[in-house]
């Protein structure tokens, strides 16, 4: 006989793993910079401090993941598979817009089942560097965009600090500063900063460690 108050089968609950996060992408003339923090949490617990939330979809196309870790990665994996087939059929790399449409269609089709927001960014020969937001099956191109739980803390900063015509290094600094500010305020963002710069020449990966992050007032 079960004792009163004793746990029964099915009574144990586990918290869903989330990339409660800050993600960002910025266009510049000739490419894009994509960045994210690295913290993954389940409830109040941090389950991974150095998770790379920048997932490749094709050679020069990446997506930044936020929301449920499993859901976001599932969308990225499905999109990467479809784009690989697409590239083989066309015998040329897929366009960034095509990749964004694939992510948008998957996100919309499974909107009742999946909890995820992906930013798609990359470079192609037709349009150069491009950044697309895909929230809830929406698709919009923007010169820069932010997402994740930490983004609510930095809208004012990015609106004030962004300026057209920035160099790749200025875009990396802009992205690093914005994500650092979000990490300082958002309990679900933290760890290191991953940066990917995508141009016609290829993909450059960088990691900004905790002791290399910029310092701001109050730290």
Curated annotation (Swiss-Prot):
SUPFAM superfamilies assigned to the protein according to its UniProt record, in alphabetical order: N-terminal nucleophile aminohydrolases (Ntn hydrolases)
Residues the record marks as active site = 21
What induces this one? Up-regulated by interferon gamma (at protein level).
Q: Where, per UniProt, does this protein localize?
A: Cytoplasm; Nucleus
What residues does the record give for site: Cleavage? 20-21
User: What is this protein's function?
Assistant: The proteasome is a multicatalytic proteinase complex which is characterized by its ability to cleave peptides with Arg, Phe, Tyr, Leu, and Glu adjacent to the leaving group at neutral or slightly basic pH. The proteasome has an ATP-dependent proteolytic activity. This subunit is involved in antigen processing to generate class I binding peptides.
> Assembly and partners?
The 26S proteasome consists of a 20S proteasome core and two 19S regulatory subunits. The 20S proteasome core is composed of 28 subunits that are arranged in four stacked rings, resulting in a barrel-shaped structure. The two end rings are each formed by seven alpha subunits, and the two central rings are each formed by seven beta subunits. The catalytic chamber with the active sites is on the inside of the barrel. Component of the immunoproteasome, where it displaces the equivalent housekeeping subunit PSMB6.
- Name the record gives this protein: Proteasome subunit beta type-9
> Which organism was this protein described from?
Mus terricolor
